[in-house]
Amino acid sequence: MRYCFSGHESFPCKSMWLKKGYDYLVDRNRFTDPDAVVKLGVGKNMVQSIRFWLRAFGLLNDDEATEIAHYLFDDRDGRDPYAEDNATLWILHYMLVVTAVSSIYRLFFVDLQREKKEFDKEQVLSFIKRKCNVPE
């Protein structure tokens, strides 16, 4: 696995960004379009961050909305277009962990959890150094 700790332009995933990004895609737009800033109503770095978070949650693949994205967010047939159901949040958390885009989540919630159920700061640092092949 190639580890990645960037791409979100320092923005956490904000409320409704996944829906906003999904709607933008199904309207046949691309995040690289010159008018993406205007159409999405956010800054240039936020456009890239929305794209990153869609990929991280497994909702975007090769600039196309994925099956799970349609299942959740489609205005007509989506199960929870506005992410109001706790089950949607569970699905999204699962997708974030199993999708290797934002590898920090997978590292902590899958790999580290497999080794230790409880841990302290030093154990986390040692784990990260070991995973990234950094000498202790």
Regions found by a protein language model. Name each.
Residues 1-136:
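Donor-sugar nucleotide-binding helix/loop cap in glycosyltransferases
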